[in-house]
């Protein structure tokens, strides 16, 4: 019987717009997509540990049923927590990257050390001496305004803007070991790529739409239209640095989908920030364009790259002429007129769920977003 691949995770974001590859998906809440098997239809009344345990039992029972129907059912998990949900079926997992390698790539300090010789990096200082004061940091960087990042974190949840000693002390006491750099006015950028044995497939650059919210930098969307309008010199630098970074990561043994974050400064300097060894929040827009062109979706490309299967298609013609913002109600970002919505993965009863408003124009150059 033909192999069928199911996505298993707590969050639907990795699965959406990959329906041409996935036979279905396991998620906490409904996703409105083909073959979705969801656990909840309402907000749970129990804590995180009990929720995980109950969801794990649910997944195990449903996977047993799928295997009875098709012994060639495979499970794709994108992180350790998802793998733990269905560890009973590890022999049915699709091939994935080594967990320790993924941890290394997620570590903001370790990855900067690995790529510092092949790409410009913002001057930073790694702090594990919690006795170091704000005043000493000011002297070291000759500025009073900083960005503080924890060792790991996604979507800006552990990235903070600091410009006084109280904020610095609060974060230091809460975070422990962290990375600190001088704040520079910038436009944050992201590149999605697929690392294969014989080549790297690089997709269009997007500007990241970042809000500074209660001293956090929160990712709320992406703007591919802005990315397409970057100068030829900046595009050339991004292409060169991306290839350099991908080859370093490939040398470590990593294969499949990956995201690279840069910042663009006011003098058009491109600097590396971090790696995201997973699907990006903007992946669904790339998938929509791939589908229009009759090309494989990112989940299929990820699967093939991990399994050493040749990818013969050419992706040089791929462009993404849209921007998007994450929303949880109609009034969110109502100042921008959208042309479409993507509601797959959104479930109204889930308070953390978002849908995407789609725009056919660049929205970055608005004062609410970080940009030069």
Can you describe what each PLM-predicted range is?
Residues 104-186, 196-199, 224-247, 372:
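Active-site nucleotide/adenylate-binding loops and adjacent lid/helix of ATP-dependent enzymes
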Residues 185, 193-248, 276-303:
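ATP-dependent carboxylate/phosphate-activation module, predominantly the ATP-grasp catalytic core
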